[in-house]
Amino acid sequence: MHHPGPPRFVATGDEVELAPRDPDPTATYTWRLTQAPAQSTVSLGDDPVEHFVPDAPGRYVVRLTAPDGEHDLTVRAFPGTLESSGTHTSGRSGGHSGGVSGGRSGPGRSGSGEYTQAGDGSDGGGGGQPRLTLRPDIEGDEAVVRADCSPHPEGTETAADLAVEFLLDDRDDVDADAVTRDGTALRIPLDALPERARIHAVAVGNHGYSVPDAVEFTRGGDGVETVTSGAGVAARRPYDAPAWAEDSVIYEIYVRTFAGERDESPFDAITDRLDYLDSLGVDAIWLTPVLQNDHAPHGYNITDFFEIASDLGTRADYERFIEAAHDRGFKVLFDLVCNHSARTHPYFESAVEGPDADYREWYEWRSDTEPETYFEWEHIANFNFDHLPVRRHLLDAVAQWADLVDGFRCDMAWAVPNGFWREIHDYCKDRDSEFLLLDETIPYIPDFQAGLFDMHFDSTTYAALRQVGGGGDAEAILGAIEGRAEIGFPEHASFMLYAENHDETRYIVDYGREAAEAAAGALFTLPGAPLLYAGQEFGQRGRRDDLAWDHADETLQSFVSDLASARHDQPALSADADLVRIPYEVRDGPSDRVVAYARTTENDAAVVVLNFGSEPTTVGLPAGTDGTDLVSGEYRGAAGDGDATVTVDSVSVFPADENDLRQ
């Protein structure tokens, strides 16, 4: 179906990309407005991909005429004085919830995020964006959606000050007259439910509106969160990350150097190390790009989106690796590059010949011979997503690789139109609701939670870890985590935590062994899925060099494995556990090199102490904290002054009584 997707929530002045889904490049697609606020003067052009900018608050309905019929899309525009969570981001995808890519500066690369004190994303503390999570249920003969609203953490509003605006999905045949709304709840009689019904909403305050959320009801479906009724209706939350992903230990492999000095094909080398990765505690494996490219070792300059790189092997070799990984219970992530191709791609080599050349419209251009790109990268050229053949080509590639793997790590996600990611999200989720979409966006963008991606690179915590490693106050990492809510991420958002990757200098090189251990401890004990970059676990010093397997630091290796075990074994360290600030006293060593915090669930609690300093530290913790370290298994208690006193080298996790933590 060519329908352009879910309704959009935007502010006036925001740009909405209008594009047919599953496009046929040879077909005709036209757009027209069928409803707009009385004061609006906006109009649409004649292109198959249009860029629509609401100019007045209110509701718009845009109609697409396509080969399979007519499709309506609702766009709800709020006054431009209201801010969405995208307002304080920069770069190509920094618009609001319905926004499209725009601008040319782009966010930074993986390591260029700069940590600032949490709260800087608000409007000064008086308002800011609220947050929203929708809860679906079946009550008697009704499908019910309840909205849990939270005001901005630093704002003056309360939950009672917030309104909720619901929109039915234009793709579903729901009788609007049968729907009732009661404050923060929406109800649909079960006998009025079609085969599929999707409901979208935002929370609206005096200063902003939230990241949209959605729920879905299906008849006879297999939703992730299912409630059974006599009518056989299933309910799910389509914007949640897959359950397997939230607590996965993700392992990034730089494909061409993983084997080290062994004379072995890359896929065979990785397969041979699967038992090692299992013993390390890894759950998911992310390979850097494996497609045919311009021979740059990183693989991000693609020359064929449908073929495995010849220096890595064949498609059959790749599939054998995936099968072996799946047999051992690993998930496999494919590094998906959509923003650009290499300049040695045959289509670009044709396009650059002149303004009338074949494939000229496939790319964006600065001049007759110079394509658009970012950061003056000279080996790539940005695709033109207004050209339907580009979208078709990339969607076909997505379909080919999605059938093999368990998720996509989406390269330069900020540089690709939001609407295109929404289409990929819906395509992947419709075929497998447990498929993962992980975005590389620096800095992260809260609106990307709204049906674009399931999990986000936590570049803010990354930057805080780097600042702490360089001598900053260790409590900065708590501010970084709390900052997620303060810039608008809802409570159901998921994150990937990292201290290094293929774009960054190794943490151990910049800050030393002790700080590297503490940073690893942060990854495994803070809310989010921890990422290990291959070699990080044994002290590899080169960023993209051959892995020095024969010189691995086995003590560090064992330490990281113990961290992974603690993460898997302790419910209080799970992604869903609360992060709680606690009182603590550093009694030996520099106090700003140490941070302590608690993780709690309804039935479990643990206290974490991280020491970024070069010497062991003694710390006083709340009474009720057990001195047995859940990472090492050693008793770390020491004589104290009536509280729990412990000695910590770099990382320790202690069982605790939640009732004592908040006193």
UniProtKB/Swiss-Prot annotation:
UniProt keyword annotations, A-Z: Carbohydrate metabolism, Cytoplasm, Glycosidase, Hydrolase, Polysaccharide degradation
Pfam families: Alpha-amylase (PF00128)
Matching InterPro entries: GH13_alpha-amylase, Glyco_hydro_13_cat_dom, Glyco_hydro_b, Glycoside_hydrolase_SF, Ig-like_fold
Marked site: Transition state stabilizer: 503
UniProt keyword annotation of RNA-binding present: no
Bilayer-spanning residue ranges: none
Catalytic reactions of this protein: Endohydrolysis of (1->4)-alpha-D-glucosidic linkages in polysaccharides containing three or more (1->4)-alpha-linked D-glucose units
Record pathway: Glycan degradation; starch degradation
BP terms from Gene Ontology: amylopectin catabolic process; carbohydrate catabolic process; glycogen catabolic process; glycogen metabolic process; oligosaccharide catabolic process; starch catabolic process
Catalytic machinery residues: 411 (nucleophile), 440 (proton donor)
Keyword Transferase part of the UniProt annotation: no
Record note on temperature dependence: Optimum temperature is 45 degrees Celsius in 2.0 M NaCl and at pH 6.5. Relatively stable up to 55 degrees Celsius.
Cellular component terms (Gene Ontology): cytoplasm
Region of interest (Disordered), residue spans: 1-28, 80-135
Enzyme class per UniProt: hydrolase
GO MF term list: alpha-1,4-glucosidase activity; alpha-amylase activity
E.C. numbers: 3.2.1.1
Primary localization: cytoplasm
Biased composition regions of type Gly residues, renumbered to the chain: 92-111
Family: Belongs to the glycosyl hydrolase 13 family.
Function: Alpha-amylase that cleaves starch into oligosaccharides, the first step in starch degradation. Endo-acting enzyme which prefers a linear polysaccharide to branched polysaccharides hydrolyzing alpha-1,4 glucosidic bonds efficiently. Also has transglycosylation activity, but does not act on alpha-1,6 bonds. Higher activities of 100%, 79% and 67.8% against amylose, soluble starch and amylopectin, respectively. Lower activity of 22% against glycogen and faint or no activity against alpha-, beta- and gamma-cyclodextrin.
Protein name as annotated: Alpha-amylase MalA
Species assigned in the record: Haloarcula japonica (strain ATCC 49778 / DSM 6131 / JCM 7785 / NBRC 101032 / NCIMB 13157 / TR-1)
